[in-house]
């Protein structure tokens, strides 16, 4: 009986790890890894950006106001003036990340959208693809 119980516990833990939040509570682990590798150098690990130079992603009003443009922004970059949380940014060009797949962009957007007190709706790959169609 003890052996069967142990097998059940191990199997349940494996299923939870594969489909659930995992032990760290981070549902968007791939998005977090991609963010760290491609975005955090400028936007910082905390999503706060660099005051006056690089806009924050944490608690950002820009994310909701420009949702339809975000997939293109990640793929192709951003140039020119933008206003985030009432502060104008116009000094640093954000380079696009052309090598990210549609799925990876979706994961990055879901990570950003649910981190640092951002509470945006979850992105789907179809929504990202529709956004990317607009900027081809």
Predicted feature descriptions by range:
Residues 19-22:
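C-terminal motif of bacterial Sec signal peptides marking the signal peptidase cleavage site
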Residues 24-50, 64-76:
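Sequence/structural segment immediately N-terminal to covalent heme-attachment motifs in c-type
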Residues 54-58, 79-135:
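Axial heme c-ligation environment in periplasmic c-type cytochrome domains
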Residues 9-17:
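Hydrophobic alpha-helical targeting segments used for export or membrane insertion
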Residues 61:
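Active-site catalytic pocket residues across diverse enzymes, especially alpha/beta-hydrolases
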Residues 16, 32-35, 128:
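Residue-level signal for mature regions of secreted extracellular proteins and peptides
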Residues 1-10:
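Bacterial N-terminal signal peptides that target proteins for export
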Residues 10, 25-26, 42-44, 80-85, ...:
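Short hydrophobic/aromatic-rich motifs at helix boundaries and adjacent loops
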């Amino acid at each position: 009986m003890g052996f069967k119980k142990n097998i059940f516990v191990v199997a349940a833990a494996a299923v939870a790890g594969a489909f659930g939040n995992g032990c760290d509570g981070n549902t968007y682990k791939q998005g977090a890894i991609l963010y760290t590798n491609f975005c955090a150098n400028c936007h910082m690990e905390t999503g706060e950006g660099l005051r006056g130079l690089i806009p924050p992603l944490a608690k950002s009003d820009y994310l909701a106001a420009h949702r339809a443009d975000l997939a293109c922004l990640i793929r192709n970059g951003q140039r020119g003036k933008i206003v985030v949380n009432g502060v104008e940014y116009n000094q640093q060009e954000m380079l696009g990340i052309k090598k990210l797949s549609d799925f990876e962009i979706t994961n990055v957007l879901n990570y950003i959208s649910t981190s640092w007190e951002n509470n945006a709706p979850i992105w789907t790959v179809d929504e990202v693809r529709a956004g990317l169609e607009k900027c081809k």
